[in-house]
Amino acid sequence: MLHVEMLTLLFLVLWMCVFSQDPGSKVVADRYAVYWNSSNPRFQRGDYHIDVCINDYLDVFCPHYEDSVPEDKTERYVLYMVNFDGYSACDHTSKGFKRWECNRPHSPNGPLKFSEKFQLFTPFSLGFEFRPGREYFYISSAIPDNGRRSCLKLKVFVRPTNSCMKTIGVRDRVFDVNDKVENSLEPADDTVHESAEPSRGENAAQTPRIPSRLLAILLFLLAMLLTL
């Protein structure tokens, strides 16, 4: 009888772990490929803008060249996440932090790729957490800074959860953002410009920690059951 009660309790805890996740989050993850180089026409127009949903990915591909291309003809960048003012002025020095560094233009394994997951919560103390309905901004500076004022910048809008369709199944869909529908740079009236600051443990909201705690309780109860 005790075993039946324990198994029932374990089932209830497991059910809560599964269904206490954000109901608006997507199951299918879209991946958006961005080729970060000055020859990309979207950067040349200055209106590079993509819309994503929570749990989507941004894949940034760095410039890459054949070995025959001399070093002084290659492009190298440091990419920063900045606030709206930094994006508008293309200035990372006031409110911004380094995200990635494209510093291997002759990488033997192909172009460097960096990925950003637009997640509500991160297990890393210096990770970045994203919120639906807000905008986020990326810019780059050239390495070395030789006086060129060309500014490569990207605006990302995280769509509200009610506009992200929930689907069944787990798979990745990959998009080159050039194939996506053109998006207006005009934000919605309720759009919030997010500050470019990584989240820290004490500042993170506590709601998503509940599934982790429940999972810990589940494992503890399972261990107790096995000792009976």
Swiss-Prot record:
Main location: membrane
Disulfide bridge positions per record: 62-102, 90-151
Listed Basic and acidic residues bias regions: 190-200
Tissue: Expressed in brain, heart, placenta and lung.
Pro-peptide positions on chain: 204-228
Disordered as annotated region, ranges: 186-205
Compartments where found: Cell membrane; Membrane, Caveola
Subunit annotation: Binds to the receptor tyrosine kinases EPHA2, EPHA3, EPHB1 and EPHB2. Interacts with EPHA8; activates EPHA8. Forms a ternary EFNA5-EPHA3-ADAM10 complex mediating EFNA5 extracellular domain shedding by ADAM10 which regulates the EFNA5-EPHA3 complex internalization and function.
Name recorded for this polypeptide: Ephrin-A5
Species assigned in the record: Rattus norvegicus (Rat)
Record gene name: Efna5
